[in-house]
């Protein structure tokens, strides 16, 4: 948090008194109480970019002559901008007119149940504005039910009301304790309680309670999830391995030099992401080892051969990835692609095992196909896709184990496609069917501007580790040392060490099996490598 922001918090905290709970005389926490207790904070929306998120912006059926629009303004509390919301009411309706902007869930979702305190949003209005500001939490108590993963008919809306903030001409921080939200509309379950781990999205709604014809505008910025969570870091966690993604550019690499640099920072194990590479634009199917008799390979490199030679000379260990396949992007419940991948992986494994199955530096095997817990473009969130994925993983792992005693690893991506508790249960259902999978290296997706390190990661890590522990799988983390984001647009680059250190310390609270993707953004000369070197030296 910047010094400027801290000053603004002190200067502009809303003095609005919170209402008493409808069902008791218990005093709700004040804004000051919550901010004093808040520790780890996640930005849910910075409102800096117009097109990073898909929004619903609508008028309600009773407001056919009303309007709402949004723009990016350079008047902001933090970051590069804020959203300016402009609205109008006709004043000619038999019911209260209403307009709203809404963001609903999907992948990379938030889970408000993690050490919950409340939400916070900055608002800047105009003294002439008419209308009431209503912030609504949308929840789906039955989300991810088999057959109906998502159903808007189940949505419930719980609102927090501020009748003054739209007329405040200075930036005002509206702090909203969860206890102050009340059920207002949607699916009525009788006992309508806020379930913070079934958060589907939110709506900012303005209602024309006075029934007058008017126009108005206000700005919103920096919607935050406030938690009481303070990470308890353990010692000095270290990387146990590092990934390398092979390519033809490594044809003449001095592996003695690379391995010595790796050992200089205490990393003695490398994971070769895959033994082959496909460049579909050139229609070139590449093998990174020789010899190969696989009919689809058109070009061969001896890169892995030289890596194994150098590994033996330098006391390094190698975990070897197999066929670089991918799952169906259209139908994960169809057996054809799984069957194809099984056969390709068996053939690649057989060649690799013949070359290095008894090599002293071979430390394990890696099934390369990356799955995720999300839904885009298709996923494995429900049956039969879930069990078909598990069966595929087990089939390949069992084939490996029939010939090699070495550990079998996988590295799916954490897309946060489900709430943390359901995500943990989902992984548990997979691992219950994959007894020959030994190690999970969970991609933290920390290089893609899609995750909060100290709110999202501890929550999901805990649930998934529980599933691993229950099924005899080692929980590990695959930390991304690169930075490449779609929104905001950031081209592929190495990240600052300070960011990587936070990821490493968070992972270290849950495991000592911590790998790093990848050597290309962690090699000598990068800020990540040099910073890590100082870190392990205690400097």
Enumerate the language-model features and the residues they cover:
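Aromatic-lined substrate-binding rim segments of carbohydrate-active enzymes
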Residues: 255-264, 268-326, 385-410, 454-459, ...
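Substrate-binding cleft of secreted/luminal carbohydrate-active enzymes
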Residues: 363, 442-453, 470-539
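Boundary/entry segment of secreted carbohydrate-active catalytic domains
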Residues: 41-43, 48-49, 227-276, 414
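C-terminal motif of bacterial Sec signal peptides marking the signal peptidase cleavage site
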Residues: 19-22
């Amino acid at each position: 948090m910047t010094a400027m922001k801290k000053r603004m918090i002190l200067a502009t905290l809303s003095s609005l008194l919170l209402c008493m709970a409808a069902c008791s005389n218990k005093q709700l926490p004040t804004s000051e109480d919550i901010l004093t207790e808040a520790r780890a904070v996640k930005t849910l929306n910075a409102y800096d970019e117009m097109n990073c998120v898909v929004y619903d912006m609508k008028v309600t059926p009773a407001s056919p002559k009303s309007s709402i629009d949004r723009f990016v303004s350079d008047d902001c509390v933090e970051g590069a901008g804020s959203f300016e919301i402009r609205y109008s009411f006709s004043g000619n309706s038999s019911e209260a007119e209403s307009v709203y902007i809404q963001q609903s869930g999907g992948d990379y979702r938030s889970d408000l149940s993690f050490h919950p305190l409340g939400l916070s949003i900055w608002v800047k209005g105009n003294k002439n504005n008419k209308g009431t500001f209503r912030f609504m939490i949308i929840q789906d108590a039955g989300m991810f039910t088999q057959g109906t993963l998502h159903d808007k008919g189940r949505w419930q809306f719980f609102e927090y009301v501020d009748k003054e903030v739209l007329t405040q001409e200075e930036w005002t921080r509206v702090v909203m304790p969860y206890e102050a939200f009340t059920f207002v509309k949607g699916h009525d379950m009788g006992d309508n309680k806020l379930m913070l781990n079934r958060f589907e999205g939110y709506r900012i709604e303005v209602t024309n309670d006075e029934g007058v014809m008017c126009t108005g505008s206000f700005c919103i910025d920096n919607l935050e999830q406030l938690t009481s969570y303070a990470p308890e870091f353990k010692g000095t966690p270290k990387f146990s391995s590092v990934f390398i993604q092979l390519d033809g550019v490594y044809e003449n690499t001095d592996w003695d030099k690379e391995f010595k640099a790796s050992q200089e920072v205490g990393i003695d194990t490398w994971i070769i992401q895959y033994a082959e590479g496909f460049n579909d634009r050139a229609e070139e199917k590449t093998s990174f080892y020789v010899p190969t008799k696989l009919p689809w390979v058109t070009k061969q490199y001896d890169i892995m051969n030289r890596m194994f030679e150098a590994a033996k000379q330098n006391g390094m260990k190698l975990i070897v990835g197999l066929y670089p396949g991918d799952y169906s992007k259209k139908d994960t419940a169809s057996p054809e692609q799984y069957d194809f991948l099984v056969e390709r992986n068996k053939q690649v494994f057989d060649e690799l095992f013949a070359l290095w199955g008894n090599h002293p530096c071979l430390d394990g095997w890696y099934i390369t196909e990356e799955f995720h817990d999300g839904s885009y473009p298709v996923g494995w969130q429900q049956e039969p896709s879930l069990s078909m994925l598990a069966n595929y993983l087990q089939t390949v792992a069992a084939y490996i184990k029939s010939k090699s005693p070495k550990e079998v690893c996988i590295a799916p991506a954490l897309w946060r496609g489900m709430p943390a508790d359901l995500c943990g249960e989902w992984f548990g259902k997979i691992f219950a069917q994959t007894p020959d999978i030994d190690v999970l290296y969970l991609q933290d997706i920390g290089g893609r501007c899609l995750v909060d390190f100290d709110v999202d990661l501890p929550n999901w890590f805990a649930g998934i580790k529980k599933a691993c522990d229950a099924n005899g799988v080692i929980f590990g983390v695959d930390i991304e040392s690169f930075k490449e984001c779609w929104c905001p647009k950031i081209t592929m680059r190495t990240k600052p060490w300070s960011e990587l250190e936070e990821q490493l310390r968070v992972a270290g609270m849950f495991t000592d099996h911590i790998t790093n993707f990848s050597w290309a953004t962690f090699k000598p000369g990068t800020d990540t490598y040099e910073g890590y070197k100082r870190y392990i030296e205690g400097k």
